[in-house]
């Protein structure tokens, strides 16, 4: 595990920060961006070995690409649980619900019994993949996050034996 931020993580953070670079951003979305970027600086990174055999909590059919606003709201609500204070959670929701679907990032949700219980961002470049911002059941413990990340990697056919690096962002 490393504190060094891989270039792909910088690309993801820049992409997210630019989501509120609009003509009339709300003060709440700008405050949410500031909170998000502060937390992003504290993250650690590890390479993700897709050859690891572990029990997955998510079948491929339970993982969905976020591609319309209602799913974005669900994604944002789950992500906001990474912050402790309710007022910070509200700012994060305001920030993340501004996301416009575009490369190089895609948002994913994991469902259980019809309820959203996991979320992550997948960033893709020519030479790397990053699975980040992983939250499972309002928690970010490494074991559950790794399982969800591996489930996403499996769904997207990302594997560590390819010529691309596969990174996982980990909350310390």
PLM regions: where:
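A short acidic/small-residue loop/turn micro-motif
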Residues: 122-126
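Conserved beta-hairpin
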Residues: 104-119
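Acyl-donor binding region in acyl/amide transferases
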Residues: 2-6, 10, 81-88, 93-97, ...
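Short, functional N-terminal and low-complexity linear motifs
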Residues: 60-63, 117-121
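Short loop/turn motifs at secondary-structure junctions and domain boundaries
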Residues: 98-103
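Acyl-donor-binding surface of acyltransferase catalytic domains
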Residues: 1-60, 165-172
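Short, Lys/Arg-enriched charge-dense amphipathic segments
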Residues: 49-56, 111, 128-137
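Short amphipathic alpha-helix that is part of the acyltransferase structural core
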Residues: 44, 48-95
């Amino acid at each position: 595990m490393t504190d060094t931020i891989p270039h792909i993580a910088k690309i993801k953070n820049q992409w997210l920060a630019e989501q509120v670079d609009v003509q009339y951003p709300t003060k709440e979305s700008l405050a949410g961006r500031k909170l998000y970027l502060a937390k992003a600086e504290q993250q650690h990174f590890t390479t993700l070995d897709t050859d690891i055999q572990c029990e997955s909590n998510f079948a491929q059919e339970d993982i969905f690409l976020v591609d319309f606003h209602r799913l974005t709201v669900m994604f944002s609500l789950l992500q906001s649980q990474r912050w402790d204070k309710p007022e910070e959670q509200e700012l994060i929701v305001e920030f993340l619900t501004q996301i416009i679907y575009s490369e190089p990032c895609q948002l994913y949700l994991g469902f259980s019994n019809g309820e959203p219980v996991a979320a992550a961002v997948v960033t893709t470049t020519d030479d790397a993949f990053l699975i980040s911002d992983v939250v499972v059941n309002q928690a970010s413990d490494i074991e559950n996050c790794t399982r969800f990340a591996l489930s996403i990697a499996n769904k997207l056919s990302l594997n560590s034996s390819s010529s691309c690096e596969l990174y996982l962002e980990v909350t310390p």
